[in-house]
Amino acid sequence: MIHFLHTRIRVADMEASIAFYLQLGFELGEQKDSPAGNKLAFLHLPGNEHFLELCWSPDYEVAVPEDLMHTAVGVQDIISYCDKLENAGIEIWPSAWREKFSSGKRKMAFVTDPDGYEVEILERS
């Protein structure tokens, strides 16, 4: 059997990225320096094996590829979740997300992290 273990993304400001993902509901695990001199932080969502690895490198400029689509998280109550994020100062898009939820079965919204990575939010029961 094969398991999806983690996703690594490069970040320009480790503390800003950690703070952003903590606001999304991730929990911070280990932080360490790699042998190559990178700073690493490991974040996870409770109940998930898959984790997010943030990597800051003194020798690398972060540039999110234009064609990188997004990662996605699932929440039980997307309206309450998005309200919480907006109250914390995180922009939810598209801008009319609340109106879009009044019709159709699929409820989704997006946020953008400090480096430009998109995170899709889907309602899942």
List the predicted regions and their residue ranges:
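Core segments of cupin and vicinal oxygen chelate
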Residues: 1-2, 8-49
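A short alpha-helix capping/helix-coil boundary motif
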Residues: 21, 59-62, 91
